[in-house]
Every structure is written in structure tokens, then in C-alpha cells.
Regions:
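A detector for small-residue-rich transmembrane helices and their helix-helix packing motifs
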Residues: 1-205
Length: 205
């Protein structure tokens, strides 16, 4: 694995373990340092949480799922664009996730989120833009899903869930924000931009 991918995985694991420990020792209030709470940030509070939330996770399964995504798709993006651009997409997608969450949830004092999902979704979208033949394997779907179909379908579902204000413990706002920014930044950085993805849609649709 490339050093940058390994470094990001280790950073996520390290911060997540620190968050698990904080929760065990000090409870939910002590763990707020590891949470992005838009209502607090809007009032100039808990800026540390906004940063650490990018790398902290709610549990081992949450951490493992995100790191599996980063491991599976990060290598392809880094190989195609180089370390600097890979890290830029990862960071920009995380920031995009924060901006969408903040815009939609800053007035909700009960809203909290954490995890690298926004950044990881950005990397997944980058992999699909760079190579539209990429397939996405999901645990609850028996066959791999073509990357562009997943991209379009997940985007539509996320918008529906956000508009419906569904509260299911998943930050659909963050996922969508990370995916959109990851896609946009990749289009700007990739040598062929959107051309491979558009050709895929022309061929099959």
C-alpha cells in the first residue's frame, strides 16, 4: 500500500481509539471533543471536534467499513493522480462534507456526526471518475454495482433522505457533500476530466 494511504488509515485508527477511550472514561460529554457539532461551531465552540471528527468513529464496525473503502479505492486514485492530489481530494471531500452538514444542521442543537465517510466517499467518487469501469461491492447486494450507477443512485437516495429529514444515525448530508466535492475536485485534477465518465454513460445509456 502507498505510504499516504497507510498514514491516513493509521491516523483514523489512532484518533478513533482515543475517542473510544474518552467515551469510556468520561462518557458522552467527554467524547464531544471528537464530534462535529454544527450548532456549537456556529457559536464559536468546539472547533477541535470539527477537526477530530474527520478521523474518529462511533465504533469498530464504523471504523473498519470506512478504512476498507479507503484501502480499496485509495490506491487507484493515488496511482492515477499522485500523492499530493490524492491527499487534496481526501481533505477537500472532508471539508465539503462539513460545509454541507454545517449549512443544513447549524440550528439543530441535537445534531452530532463523526467519521471519515465524507472523505472516503470523495475518494470512491474519484475512483469512478478516473475509471468508470470500477465496480462497488456492497454487503447487502449480491452482485457488484457499476460505479457510475452507484454514484447516481446514491446521490438521488441521499437527496431524498435529506429532504425528508430522516434521522437514522447516518450523516447523509456529510456523505453527499463529500461525494460531490470529491467528484468536482477530481474532474478538475484528472487529465481527461469528465470525459471517461461521459463516454461510459453514452455507451450504456
Amino acid at each position: 500500500l502507498p505510504v499516504a494511504v497507510v498514514a491516513l488509515i493509521l491516523l483514523n485508527v489512532g484518533v478513533s481509539l482515543a475517542g473510544f477511550r474518552a467515551f469510556r472514561q468520561r462518557g458522552a460529554e467527554g467524547a464531544e471533543t471528537f464530534l462535529f457539532i454544527p450548532h456549537q461551531v456556529a457559536r464559536g465552540q468546539n472547533g477541535t471536534g470539527m477537526v477530530l471528527a474527520h478521523f474518529s468513529h462511533s465504533g469498530v464496525a464504523h471504523l473498519a467499513f470506512n478504512m476498507l473503502g479507503l484501502y480499496s479505492f485509495g490506491d487507484n486514485v493515488l496511482e492515477a493522480l499522485g500523492t499530493g492530489r490524492f491527499v487534496l481530494i481526501y481533505a477537500a471531500a472532508g471539508l465539503g462534507a462539513d460545509l454541507v452538514v454545517f449549512a443544513l444542521r447549524k440550528d439543530d442543537p441535537t445534531y452530532r456526526c463523526l467519521g471519515a465517510s465524507g472523505s472516503v466517499f470523495g475518494i470512491v467518487m474519484a475512483a469512478v471518475v478516473l475509471d468508470p469501469t470500477t465496480s462497488i461491492a456492497l454487503l447487502f447486494v449480491p452482485v457488484p454495482i457499476p460505479g457510475p450507477v452507484f454514484m447516481l443512485g446514491y446521490g438521488i437516495i441521499s437527496v431524498i433522505l435529506i429532504v425528508g429529514k430522516r434521522r437514522d444515525g447516518i450523516s447523509h448530508e456529510g456523505h453527499l457533500g463529500g461525494a460531490l466535492i470529491g467528484l468536482a475536485v477530481t474532474v478538475l485534477l484528472a487529465p481527461r476530466g469528465l470525459e471517461p465518465l461521459l463516454r461510459w454513460f453514452e455507451r450504456y445509456w
